[in-house]
Regions:
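ABC family nucleotide-binding domain
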Residues: 11-223
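H-loop (His-switch) and adjacent beta-strand-loop-beta switch element
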Residues: 220-232
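ABC-family P-loop ATPase nucleotide-binding domain
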Residues: 1-21, 229-236
């Protein structure tokens, strides 16, 4: 069952002096430059910035997908880049729920198999009560045997959300989750993410170029030229 939490605040994520440089010498490109901030458990943070600002690079490093050139990423007090590749892959699968713009579903697996894949890769049994709760909230009960190509874009993104949630991750990271959807489906997906954030205290960090989405977050971090230009709480 998805845990409903409340009460005192606690730090779930800390980024310390994070930098990322691609290439070397005259061709070196600094994608991130000395970025530091922390996120509390249950916080909804929107990261915004123009194309090429470094926001997607930052998200990939928060999710353990791309190693920084320097600096630290601590998730629930674990410095994830002190882990070796095998340990990092396991940590990412168990503690980070990733949601992508283009869904990244396995085309030969049906809805149920895509959602439960992180558990099966870990050799864990599916908690039927939790699974049923997730698919009910996502309105996927009648789509469990469908393959991704039999679903609409909005339905595929719901599957992606279910997969991200199935392990009760410490953090959900969403990279432009509405970028491939029409306005109706975009609104529904954002409402679902907000519901999981508020009802179940699920920490949510979302990359978006859509100001309307960003303004629904608790906090907005603006990145430009690889640096934080603004970090403000818009609601508490």
């Amino acid at each position: 069952m998805i845990k409903k939490l409340g009460g005192f605040k606690m730090e779930i994520l800390r980024i310390e002096h994070l930098s990322k440089v691609y290439g070397s010498g005259d061709t070196a490109v600094k994608a991130l430059n000395d970025v530091s901030f922390s996120v509390e458990k249950g916080e909804f943070v929107a990261i915004i910035g123009p194309s090429g600002s470094g926001k997607s690079t930052l998200l990939h490093m928060l999710g353990g997908v791309d190693r920084p050139t320097s600096g630290k990423v601590l998730v629930d007090n674990t410095d994830i880049y002190n882990l070796d590749e095998t340990q990092l892959a396991i940590f990412r699968r168990r503690q980070i729920g990733l949601i992508y713009q283009f869904y990244n579903l396995i085309p030969v697996l049906n809805v149920e198999e895509n959602i439960t894949l992180p558990l099966l890769l870990d050799g864990h049994k599916v908690d039927k009560k939790q699974f049923d709760e997730i698919i009910k909230i996502l309105n996927l009960e009648k789509r469990l045997n469908h393959l991704p190509n039999q679903l609409s874009g909005g339905q595929q993104q719901r599957v992606s959300i279910g997969r991200a949630l199935i392990n009760n991750p410490a953090i959900m990271l969403a990279d432009e989750p509405t970028g491939n959807l029409d306005s109706k489906n975009s609104s529904e997906i954002v409402d679902l993410l907000k519901m999981f954030n508020k009802t179940f205290n699920q920490t949510l960090i979302i990359i978006t170029h859509d100001e309307r989405i960003a303004l629904q977050a608790d906090r907005i971090i603006a990145i430009e030229d690889g640096e934080i230009k603004k970090d403000e709480v818009v609601r508490s």
